[in-house]
């Protein structure tokens, strides 16, 4: 099962000609999950190999404009491109409290009626995620009625035992959110692929006298079969070790995690995506504004024993290497060196718009 991440926007604060506002897509077998949706994300999607109509889930890390102002426009474009008869499953949208009302207000004020259903699930933040004066209580707007295509979403509270939020638990994935510290409540997401049955052991099947055909499929799917001689063959008799799932972790803007839940959820991540807005010489400024530097990101990655660190959300002063004029590339390359020095020279990737990173199946 193929899995990859496409970066649509790797810049901080606002979109520019060289770096779009924050957005990336996790793609698995054709299904696309969008993480953040800064202004201009739909245009970036059009320039990529991805199809907006394949998006089934959207995750918003926090409610700063450069991470979600592109959402209403994207939803409208998906609607316009979908035609009048749509029977698709609802698009599931996850984000902090306030996101549901934002979408509702933009749809109401623009007299927009989406042709597809959607559901907004809101994460309730805690007081230790940002400065006290910035934490706002959820305010329910006085709605005359719900948009016709909006389903009833969940209000997701922090699990006090695990210090995380359970967002998705289906046949393939478990997705949990964890708290980050920023100027406003921000979240990170851990996407874990569930273990899959191991491959069939052809030699054992032959030795046990299992004939090729439907019995193979049943055993592969965890169902025992009875042979003509009355012998029962269990899946564990003929299956190799289960294939361990992959783990991708995506952090929103932050100057740190609130507790150790983030470390636990990101432990041994195959891919850890972390912001690095400013270089290490500006660490005090970064922390003041709730952001990270390469050293801070790499320290977290090292604590998690992440297998690969990707830095993103760069200040627009840091041009991509390929697009920087002579001498300008030094700044972005220095960020890479700063992170690698913490990770004992383990290679660190600098995200660029339209970069695609594959996450191979574990052997």
UniProtKB/Swiss-Prot annotation:
Q: Where is the active site?
A: 66
How does the cofactor attach, per the note?
Binds 2 Zn(2+) ions.
Q: Which UniProt keywords apply?
A: Cytoplasm, Endonuclease, Hydrolase, Metal-binding, Nuclease, Nucleus, tRNA processing, Zinc
- Gene Ontology BP, a term: rescue of stalled ribosome
The record, for Pfam families, names: Lactamase_B, Lactamase_B_2
Give the EC number(s) listed in the UniProt record. Answer: 3.1.26.11
Disulfide bonds, paired cysteine numbers: none
Say yes or no: keyword tRNA processing present.
Answer: yes
One GO molecular-function entry: tRNA-specific ribonuclease activity
Q: Where does Zn(2+) 2 bind?
A: 66-67, 253, 313
Q: Which residues form the signal peptide?
A: none
UniProt KW Zinc keyword: yes
Q: Which cofactor does it need?
A: Zn(2+)
Compartment(s): Cytoplasm, Cytosol; Nucleus
Binding positions for Zn(2+) 1?
A: 62, 64, 182, 253
Source taxon at top rank: Eukaryota
- Which InterPro entries did the record assign? Metallo-B-lactamas, RibonucZ/Hydroxyglut_hydro, RNase_Z/BN
Q: Under the cellular component aspect of Gene Ontology, which terms does the record hold? A: cytosol; nucleoplasm; nucleus
Q: Describe the subunit structure.
A: Homodimer.
What does this protein do, in the record's words? Zinc phosphodiesterase, which displays some tRNA 3'-processing endonuclease activity. Specifically involved in tRNA repair: acts downstream of the ribosome-associated quality control (RQC) pathway by removing a 2',3'-cyclic phosphate from tRNAs following cleavage by ANKZF1. tRNAs are then processed by TRNT1.
Q: Which family does it belong to?
A: Belongs to the RNase Z family.
Q: What is this protein called?
A: Zinc phosphodiesterase ELAC protein 1
- Source species, please? Bos taurus (Bovine)
Encoding gene, per UniProt annotation: ELAC1
């Amino acid at each position: 099962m193929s899995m990859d991440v496409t970066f649509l926007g790797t810049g901080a604060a606002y979109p520019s000609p060289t770096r779009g506002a924050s957005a990336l897509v996790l793609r698995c077998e054709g299904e696309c999950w969008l993480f953040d949706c800064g202004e201009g994300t739909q245009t970036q999607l059009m320039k990529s190999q991805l199809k907006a109509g394949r998006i089934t889930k959207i995750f918003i890390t926090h409610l700063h404009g450069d991470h979600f102002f592109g959402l209403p426009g994207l939803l409208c474009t998906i609607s316009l491109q979908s035609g009048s008869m749509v029977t698709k499953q609802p698009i599931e949208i996850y984000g902090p409290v306030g996101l549901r009302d934002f979408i509702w207000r933009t749809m109401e004020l623009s007299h927009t009626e989406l042709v597809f259903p959607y559901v907004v699930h809101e994460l309730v933040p805690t007081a230790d995620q940002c400065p006290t004066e910035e934490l706002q209580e959820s305010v329910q707007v006085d709605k005359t009625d719900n948009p016709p295509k909006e389903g009833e979403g969940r209000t997701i509270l922090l699990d006090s035992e695990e210090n995380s939020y359970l967002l998705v638990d289906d046949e393939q994935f478990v997705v949990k959110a964890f708290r980050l510290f920023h100027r406003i409540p921000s979240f990170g997401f851990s996407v874990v692929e569930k273990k899959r049955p191991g491959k069939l052991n052809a030699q054992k099947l032959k030795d046990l006298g299992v004939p090729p055909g439907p019995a193979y499929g049943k055993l592969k799917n965890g169902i025992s079969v009875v042979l003509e001689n009355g012998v029962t063959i269990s899946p564990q008799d003929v299956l190799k070790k289960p294939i361990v799932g992959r783990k991708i972790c995506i952090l929103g803007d932050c100057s740190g995690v609130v507790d150790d839940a983030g470390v636990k959820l990101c432990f041994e991540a195959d891919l850890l995506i972390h912001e690095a807005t400013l270089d290490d010489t500006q660490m005090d400024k970064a922390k003041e504004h709730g952001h990270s530097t390469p050293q801070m990101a790499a320290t977290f990655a090292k604590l998690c024993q992440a297998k690969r660190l990707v830095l993103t959300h760069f200040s627009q002063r840091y041009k991509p290497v390929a697009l920087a004029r002579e001498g300008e590339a030094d700044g972005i390359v220095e960020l890479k060196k700063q992170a690698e020095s913490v990770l004992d020279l383990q290679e660190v990737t600098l995200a660029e718009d339209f970069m695609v990173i594959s996450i191979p199946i574990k052997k």
